[in-house]
């Protein structure tokens, strides 16, 4: 049995109801540019019929399916008549092709449904469809969904390819339309420079309804390595089960002085030798040997020695007190670990209090300490000065190196300013070297 053609019916707001019985039908004129006939009944349902060799067409179910109408076409016109036959074949033949259920509102605000879709109406041109208020819906049309993108992902571009499995497609079946949709995983905003294809990492979900399409989904997603925001330009793809080892296990960054223009030096720990703590040896003043201490250069000044050291541009403190060897030794003792400017402000007051070695032994220690306190080490230096003064007053010493607190610096100063043996010594102090160079130039040595 060939199923009859099922037509789609739609209510028209510009038609009036027939006031006879339920089978009363109003006939409309045939459009001159179309071969279709528009028919409506009192329930404001209508359809288009196309004439062919068979003049009779079964309308199937009209509106709620209460009656079956048969189109009778003759030479003088066509009319609809009610078919009272209770044939089950004719009744169920209307359900052979089931379409999408559409809901519409009538003039009174009630919702009515229409379940019939005619495939022949889809072939008509756009003008005939708009004039006859026929709506067409195809379940197999493709619905491309726009992916919701966070404002943080505006810089990233996701290519949506129209290959199989990538496009969003809706498939029709008897139970309705179900969507097979390709999802794109969420990407961190730190990967704005990278472009991710939609088909490379996707989540394919299939279900019977549009709302529950996420149920039963299978994920096929590529792992993405998390990268610090400071490395936005570089994108490192991490393969599964191939995680790169940390570089800190192999290299160590060493802090380098700013005077080295290189950004940094990486030292391999396997080749790095353990640094030994080198003990810094303090700077020790040169010490005279026993033979040097007993040299004739450091002999005690005799009364017949008439050496007068000349004045120099260096303006040393010893140049002003060369006439008293005790003062020269005291000045050298105070200049140890002290600048000449500090000592110059104290030395005049000290020699005012202690004019010679004998007076220094008679002055109380507290008075000397108060004078040399700005230089530091006042207690130690006070005891050294008084002990030096006691030994200096004795007649038993023959060399200046035998006195307490006299080192190479004081012995060289004694030989240069007191004895005049400057050409036989080589001082280590920088100020004495200036004066020694001056004497060499003066006497052309």
UniProtKB/Swiss-Prot annotation:
Look up keyword Nucleus and say if it applies.
yes
Give the source's domain of life in one word.
Answer: Eukaryota
Output this protein's name: Methyl-CpG-binding domain protein 4-like protein
EC number per UniProt: 3.2.2.-
What is this protein for, i.e. what is its function? Answer: Monofunctional DNA glycosylase targeting U:G and T:G mispairs. Excises uracil derivatives and exhibits a preference for a CpG sequence context, irrespective of the methylation status of the complementary strand. The activity follows a biphasic kinetics, with an initial burst of product accumulation followed by a slower phase. Specifically binds its reaction product. Triggers the base excision repair (BER) pathway.
Its localization reads: Nucleus
Which enzyme class?
hydrolase
| Gene this chain is encoded by | MBD4L
Q: What is known of its domains?
A: The N-terminal domain (1-290) does not play any direct role in catalysis and is not required for product binding.
Q: Does the keyword Cytoplasm apply?
A: no
Report where it is expressed, by tissue: Isoform 1 and isoform 4: Expressed in leaves and flowers, but not in roots or stems.
Which key words tag this protein in UniProt? DNA damage, DNA repair, Hydrolase, Nucleus
Q: Gene3D superfamilies annotated for this entry? A: Hypothetical protein, domain 2 (1.10.340.30)
Q: Which SUPFAM superfamilies match?
A: DNA-glycosylase
One GO process term, biological-process aspect: DNA repair
What would you give as a GO molecular function for this chain, any one?
hydrolase activity
Principal location: nucleus
